[in-house]
């Protein structure tokens, strides 16, 4: 399929980080609001906010976020940022998106976690009204931070549960802060009633995927380390887990050292549930259309495959059953003319 046709396909995205997905125009607006100087030249600015095609590691990739952090410290900035990412998604026919962010990273200048979430939800709502997309929020704890900080944030933001906030996650340094370290807090938070997704297996540790599944988590981000792990793949499928795959990002961070090391084909051939995601639109210089192009190029993914993956994404999404039903109907209708071809 040509790029224009891939762009027209209806899409769902489950794994998109707010601070890693801001457009250059919005970064300029945010910098002006924060009174931070940025390069006038777009290519120079892009270099500051985009990770190299090949990073030494995940931690090298994550350094790129340091530039954005000071720009997301006010309600106005957070609302603008959330609206921007929803707009970008809608313009490439994403009908459903879950945008994740860590309130802790926007609390440097006095905002509370509740205020951060409120501001982000306001931006999501503006984008939904303007573009006809459904956009929800996932709150992340940072793995490398004190568990008490994350515990307090998770408890405080519960007032937004099912008012746009639909789930929780842990992001950051997976290698040194595995699921075992987070397990008690994850169990506590699950008891509140909102589901968890979790970055797992991005650092080359299959046992972290095992631990996440054993915590009852039904969606896992990346799962790159499941490659060539036959027993783990069987466990993944038996537990009805959905993978949030991030191809470009995984190649950058060396989670997958080569295309052949990326687990998509093994997951697909085994019948595992999966979704295709950007991870970070700006940091990885990508969007869903570009990701779809890469899947066609490297894996010969078909329109029928994309429909199936998007159906998996919506079914595994954290929105309400009624909204899932409406989104699935919208998705199926959007693909009818392409499938007939």
UniProtKB/Swiss-Prot annotation:
Keywords: Hydrolase, Metal-binding, Nucleotide metabolism, Zinc. InterPro entries: A_deaminase, A_deaminase_dom, Ado/ade_deaminase, Metal_Hydrolase. It is an enzyme of class 3 (hydrolase). Substrate binds at residues 17, 19, 172. Binds 1 zinc ion per subunit. GO terms for biological process: adenosine catabolic process; hypoxanthine salvage; inosine biosynthetic process; nucleotide metabolic process; purine ribonucleoside monophosphate biosynthetic process. The record marks 222 as: Important for catalytic activity. The active site is at residue 202. Its EC number is 3.5.4.4. Its cofactor is Zn(2+). It comes from the Bacteria. Belongs to the metallo-dependent hydrolases superfamily. Adenosine and AMP deaminases family. Adenosine deaminase subfamily. Catalyzes the hydrolytic deamination of adenosine and 2-deoxyadenosine. HAMAP family: A_deaminase (MF_00540). This is Adenosine deaminase. It comes from Streptococcus equi subsp. zooepidemicus (strain MGCS10565). The gene is add.
């Amino acid at each position: 399929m040509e790029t224009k046709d891939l762009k027209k396909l209806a899409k769902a995205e489950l794994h998109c980080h707010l601070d890693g997905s801001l457009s250059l125009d919005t970064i300029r607006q945010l910098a002006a609001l924060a009174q931070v100087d940025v390069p006038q030249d777009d290519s120079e600015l892009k270099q500051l906010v985009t990770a190299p095609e090949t990073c030494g590691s995940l931690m090298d990739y994550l350094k790129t976020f340091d530039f954005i952090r000071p720009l997301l410290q006010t309600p106005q900035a957070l609302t603008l940022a959330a609206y921007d990412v929803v707009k970008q998604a809608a313009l490439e026919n994403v009908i459903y998106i879950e945008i994740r962010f860590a309130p802790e990273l926007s609390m440097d200048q006095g905002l509370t976690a509740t205020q951060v979430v409120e501001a982000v939800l306001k931006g999501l709502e503006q984008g939904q009204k303007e573009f006809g997309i459904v956009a929800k929020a996932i709150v992340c704890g940072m793995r490398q931070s004190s568990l008490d900080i994350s515990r307090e944030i998770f408890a405080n933001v519960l007032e937004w549960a099912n008012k746009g906030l639909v789930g929780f996650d842990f992001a950051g340094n997976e290698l040194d802060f595995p699921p075992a370290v987070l397990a008690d807090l994850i169990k506590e938070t699950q008891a509140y009633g909102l589901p968890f997704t979790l970055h797992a297996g991005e650092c080359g540790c299959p046992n972290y995927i095992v631990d996440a599944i054993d915590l009852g988590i039904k969606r896992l981000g990346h799962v790159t380390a499941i490659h060539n792990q036959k027993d783990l793949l069987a466990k993944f499928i038996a537990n009805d887990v959905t993978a949030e795959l991030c191809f470009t990002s995984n190649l950058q961070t060396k989670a997958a050292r080569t295309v052949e090391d990326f687990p998509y084909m093994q997951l697909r051939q085994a019948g595992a549930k999966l979704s295709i995601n950007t991870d970070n639109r700006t940091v990885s210089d990508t969007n869903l259309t570009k990701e779809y192009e890469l899947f066609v190029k490297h894996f010969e993914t078909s329109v029928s495959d994309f429909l199936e993956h998007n159906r998996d994404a919506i079914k595994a999404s954290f929105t309400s059953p009624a909204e899932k039903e409406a989104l699935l109907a919208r998705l199926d209708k959007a693909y009818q003319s392409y499938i007939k071809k």
